[in-house]
């Protein structure tokens, strides 16, 4: 589909979405895009518009205690790993609140470069510029942490943390 930069989102999705379900419209992709509405316009650098279920219509009895054969899990928290090759319908729910940062090495499995991602995030959070530089802050962008943000069991907003760290570095070096 050919579209113009700045085209209204509603005109792009007209006839392709159901009005009776709660959906989340994302200007961009699921990992790095941002939430928008039908009244917003296509961003200049966006190459796609993504629509996913909001997930607010799901009530799960006993939540985390159930075996969840139909839920996707990166680290085998649910029994869904027994059914290989299955396609899952993901929604926008976080499924739990924020937790303390857990040093489990899960970022290292999905980061596109060979750095200590968890230590870099910790250095950014505390504002230790020397440690940030030693751990490779100049080599990363917020988008590099999109997949680690998806798999993060601590549910931290890693892309925002990295953006704040880069902004802090720019102010310090200016």
Would you name each region that the model predicts?
Residues 1-174:
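Redox cofactor-anchoring modules in respiratory/redox and cofactor-processing assemblies
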